[in-house]
Amino acid sequence: MHKMHTNKRLARPLRSVMVAVLCALTLLACREFDAPEAEQSLPERVNVSIAHLREMVGERTVHFEQDLVIGGYVTTSDREGNFYRTFCIDDGTAGVEIMAGMYDLHRLYPEGYYVTVRLNGCSAGVHNGVLQVGTRAAAYSNYPTDYFYSRVLIDKHLTRYDLISPVAPIPLRVEQLAEEYCGRLVNVSSLKLVAAPEGGIWSGYCTFADEKGHRVAVYCSPYADFAQQEVPTERVSITGILQRGEVDGEDMYVLKMRYESDCGIYN
């Protein structure tokens, strides 16, 4: 009886240790899945700029079989839901949207981190004025590229490094907006709301005008965290990724904000 009582006393701390070890392993596994370990060495050699890549693509969809590598710093975040399964990088010459096809990309590729993309086996094309890189789209698709989807495929083509340099938005006036800035983080100031969805909320397309009457649209996904928030009626300054598309039958430049805070009161 005394021996059995001693084993029970020993078993309790042993069980506690085993539980603690299992918890630690579980947390480690989750951490490894959520965020790939960044490379500590210098980034692999980039041999083509994003601007040059855009020139190569033009209005076509191109599938690459050459060992081309681009790189840039992450300029977007899906934390508030206005970006969905994609993120953008900028190398100082141009911007490109990466069709990752994964959720919680702000954990995998945080804003400001340096990422390289190996283009061999990828496709590139332009959608809404923005250069996109992903996989080859199906023949029946209306889009130039498709998502990577698989984490294995993403890791084959993308590498994130421990180099951090947040990209400042390019300050532009509405009349300065041009195709060369599409896919890049820009800021436009002194804008006044002239049209908004029913209820004056962000969800959908809002139209703003500057003091000269030049107009620009702002897009917000219905699933964004701030979609149901009211749009400010004061003059504002708005930061976002520049796109181009049809809004209410009119070809317009469009800003796609990352956060609700990308719209601030302009003084």
Feature map (PLM): residue ranges:
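Bacterial N-terminal signal peptides that target proteins for export
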Residues: 2-18
